Structure formats: structure tokens, C-alpha cells
């Protein structure tokens, strides 16, 4: 977000930065600018590199092109725009102690900032709803939320985010009326974000607090359902091991199906944990800023500007965290290694999206229609329908199977955040 407009102090600047005629002070100021410039450049590099890697991996490997990962792509796009169009200009504003890009770009830059944060949390909210349906209505899920429907949802998220961010700022509904704010609006080198109280509170509620409440509520429900499913798995495992060995030998496929069902559900729960970490990290990074944002307009001089800007940058840094969190997923981890040439590439055999061996074993070897979850008639099915319900021999362009197999990740689900 833009800088608050109460004072002209800059983030962590040395005390004597306004006395450049003193040699010692000038040297300290130069050292501060260089040091902060390096740190901010590394932040920008991490945001851009990490999210380009995520988007490229999902675009290149069809194995990663699941409905949930479509939403992850949207989240990565928001983070990438943050790294390209927001953070560098924010860094320039701090390091140069003035705005050098004019009034139009000041408001446009601020609008993009609000857009990225709003799109991110609304996407996380959609992911929470997506996981809720995936784990509570597994057999309806694939028809309920197809890839085409996911694209429409993503488009709607960005349209709503764009309207709530650009419209109030470009129409000047956000502007305060006191003299200091009016002077700043008229000055080409001032980009302090003076806002009226109504806009600050309303935008914080619409762009952050409301989606946050929905996200927390839905995800808490998801974890409750997941916990019940884990308990069912434990009980079912106990019954399975208590069966007569001769009965298991008579129907070995049943035992294999049961183990696959349990493994599938456990992987689904690991995916939930990964998404929970993403949502939790976003909340921890941005919640302090939005609390201060409300307090600042209610009590103007209560929060030092340095604290406001520092918390704003903590939120910016969140855009670099998500690619690291995705590394919890073996599929993402292997895809990243392939793209970075950190492991032997098998992409040549899959260059056209197909294996050159139509009989080659996939990660879902042995999976057939009529998924194993259907065999557990005495327990409620709460996990997503396993990939055995599709003709998986015809899946195209996956992350190379020999790469997956070499890591011992056979039997992974069709949700790549595992």
C-alpha cells in the first residue's frame, strides 16, 4: 500500500539524513541507501524468480494442471505483479526519499498494490472453498468445479479485485480533505497515501477482513472434516488388520484398494496442511499492517510512520514465501528441479506432452475405474475421488514418471499440493 501521509520520515533512515553537508552523516546515509537497496533488490528478485518458476512449472507440466493449481497460478500472478510493478517503485520511494514518477503513476501504482493484495486473499478464499468441496463431496467435485469453471472463477476474482481497488482511487473517493493532503495531491514528488477515514475502514474490510473471515471459517470446517476422516481411516485400518488372512488372500485387490484409499486420503490431508501454511503465512504477514491501517486513520499520530512502512514491507515479502512453501509438494519440487536443470531431465521423451512409450507405467499404475474408496461401504467417504476414476493411461505431459518414481512418489494424487 502507499505510504501514510502524517510525516516525512523514511524507513530506518539514519537520524542525520537531512544534513548532507556533514561528511560523516553523508557517508552513513550512502551506506544506508546501498544496504537497503541490496536488501530490497533481493526481495524483488526472490518474488519475481520464485513466482515465474511456479507459473512456468504449472504451464509446462500437465500433471500440475489441476483445478487447485489453477488457483495457485492466479495467486502466483498476483505475487508476480507485486514483484514487478509494486515493490520496485516502493523501494525507489523509500531510497530516494521522494516520488519521481508523477501523480498519475502514484495513483495507478497504489491501485495495483491494493489489487494484488485483494486478488491474493480472494484467491485464498476460493481455494478454501475448493478444498471444502473436494473433501466433503469427492464424487461430485470433478463435475462441480471443472477447469473451465475454475477459469471463470479466477476471472471474476480479478474483476472484483480490480473494481474494489482501481475505482475508488481513480475516482478520488479515497482522498482526505485537510490541507496537508491537498498539498500532497498537487505535488508531483509526493505520493503519501492520505485517505479519509471512511475509505480506509471500508477498503480494509472489503479487501482484507471480510475475505479473511470467510477463509478462516471455511478452512476450519475443512480441517474438522479432515480430522474426522483421519479417525475413520484409523478405525478402518484396525478392522482391516483384524481380518482373516485367508480372506485377504482370496481378494487381494480389496486389500490393495484399501491401502490405496488410506494413502490417498493421507496425501489429501498433507495437501490441506500445505494450503493451510500458505493461508496462515499470508495472514501473519498482512494482518499487522491492516490493523495499523485502521488504527492510523482513527488516531493519526499513534503509529510511527516507520512502523507502518515496515509492516507494509512484511506484507510485500509474503509474495516471496509461497514458492518456498510449494516445495513441500514432491511434484512441484521435482518440476522446479527439472526447470532449473538440477536433475537429469526427462523432458525430451515428453516434449510433445506424450510419453514415447505408450506402455510405460504411470504414477497411478494399477489404478482402475471404480476407485477403492467405494469399497469402504461402512465408512463415510470424505476424501477427493481418487485418480483411479479416470483413464489415467491417457494423461498427457506429466512431470516425467521416471523422475517421480525415482523419488518414491508412486501413487500420488491428482492434487499436486502434496
Swiss-Prot record:
Modified residue annotations for Phosphotyrosine: 141
Extracellular side: 1-34, 96-106, 175-196, 299-305
Protein location: Cell membrane; Early endosome; Golgi apparatus
GO biological process: adenylate cyclase-activating adrenergic receptor signaling pathway; AMPA selective glutamate receptor signaling pathway; bone resorption; brown fat cell differentiation; cellular response to amyloid-beta; diet induced thermogenesis; heat generation; negative regulation of G protein-coupled receptor signaling pathway
Pfam families: 7tm_1
CDD domains: 7tmA_Beta2_AR
GO cellular component terms, semicolon-separated: apical plasma membrane; ciliary basal body; early endosome; Golgi apparatus; intercellular bridge; mitotic spindle; neuronal dense core vesicle; nucleus
InterPro entries: ADR_fam, ADRB2_rcpt, GPCR_Rhodpsn, GPCR_Rhodpsn_7TM
Topology versus the membrane: Multi-pass membrane protein
Family per record: Belongs to the G-protein coupled receptor 1 family. Adrenergic receptor subfamily. ADRB2 sub-subfamily.
Functional note: Beta-adrenergic receptors mediate the catecholamine-induced activation of adenylate cyclase through the action of G proteins. The beta-2-adrenergic receptor binds epinephrine with an approximately 30-fold greater affinity than it does norepinephrine.
Name this polypeptide is given: Beta-2 adrenergic receptor
Species for this entry: Felis catus
Gene that encodes the chain: ADRB2
Amino acid at each position: 500500500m502507499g505510504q501514510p501521509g502524517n510525516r516525512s520520515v523514511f524507513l530506518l533512515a539514519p537520524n542525520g539524513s537531512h544534513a548532507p553537508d556533514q561528511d560523516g552523516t553523508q557517508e552513513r546515509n550512502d551506506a544506508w541507501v546501498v544496504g537497503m537497496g541490496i536488501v530490497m533488490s533481493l526481495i524483488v528478485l526472490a518474488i519475481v524468480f520464485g513466482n515465474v518458476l511456479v507459473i512456468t512449472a504449472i504451464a509446462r507440466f500437465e500433471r500440475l494442471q489441476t483445478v487447485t493449481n489453477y488457483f495457485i497460478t492466479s495467486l502466483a500472478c498476483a505475487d508476480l505483479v507485486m514483484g514487478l510493478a509494486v515493490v520496485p517503485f516502493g523501494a525507489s520511494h523509500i531510497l530516494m526519499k521522494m516520488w519521481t514518477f508523477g501523480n498519475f503513476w502514484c495513483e495507478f501504482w497504489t491501485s495495483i498494490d491494493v489489487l494484488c493484495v485483494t486478488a491474493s486473499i480472494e484467491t485464498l478464499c476460493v481455494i478454501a472453498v475448493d478444498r471444502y468441496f473436494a473433501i466433503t463431496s469427492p464424487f461430485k467435485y470433478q463435475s462441480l468445479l471443472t477447469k473451465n469453471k475454475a477459469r471463470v472463477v479466477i476471472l471474476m476474482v480479478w474483476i472484483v479485485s480490480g473494481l474494489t481497488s482501481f475505482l475508488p482511487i481513480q475516482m478520488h473517493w479515497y482522498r482526505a480533505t485537510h490541507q496537508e493532503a491537498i498539498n500532497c495531491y498537487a505535488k508531483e514528488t509526493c505520493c503519501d497515501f492520505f485517505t479519509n477515514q471512511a475509505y480506509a475502514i471500508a477498503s480494509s474490510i472489503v479487501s482484507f477482513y471480510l475475505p479473511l473471515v470467510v477463509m478462516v471459517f471455511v478452512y476450519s470446517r475443512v480441517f474438522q472434516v479432515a480430522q474426522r476422516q483421519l479417525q475413520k481411516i484409523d478405525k478402518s485400518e484396525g478392522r482391516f488388520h483384524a481380518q482373516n488372512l485367508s480372506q485377504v488372500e482370496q481378494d487381494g485387490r480389496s486389500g490393495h484398494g484399501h491401502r490405496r484409499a488410506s494413502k490417498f486420503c493421507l496425501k489429501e490431508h498433507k495437501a490441506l496442511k500445505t494450503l493451510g501454511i500458505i493461508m496462515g503465512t499470508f495472514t501473519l504477514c498482512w494482518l499487522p499492517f491492516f490493523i495499523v491501517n485502521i488504527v492510523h486513520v482513527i488516531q493519526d499520530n499513534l503509529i510511527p510512520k516507520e512502523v507502518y512502512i515496515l509492516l507494509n514491507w512484511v506484507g510485500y515479502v509474503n509474495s516471496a514465501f509461497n514458492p518456498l512453501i510449494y516445495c513441500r509438494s514432491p511434484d512441484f519440487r521435482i518440476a522446479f528441479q527439472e526447470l532449473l536443470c538440477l536433475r537429469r531431465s526427462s523432458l525430451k521423451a515428453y516434449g510433445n506432452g506424450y510419453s514415447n512409450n505408450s506402455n510405460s507405467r504411470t504414477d497411478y499404475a494399477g489404478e482402475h475405474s471404480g476407485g477403492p474408496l467405494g469399497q469402504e461401504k461402512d465408512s463415510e467417504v470424505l476424501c477427493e475421488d481418487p485418480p483411479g476414476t479416470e483413464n489415467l493411461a491417457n494423461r498427457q505431459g506429466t512431470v516425467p514418471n521416471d523422475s517421480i518414481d525415482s523419488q518414491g512418489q508412486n501413487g500420488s494424487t491428482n492434487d499436486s499440493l502434496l
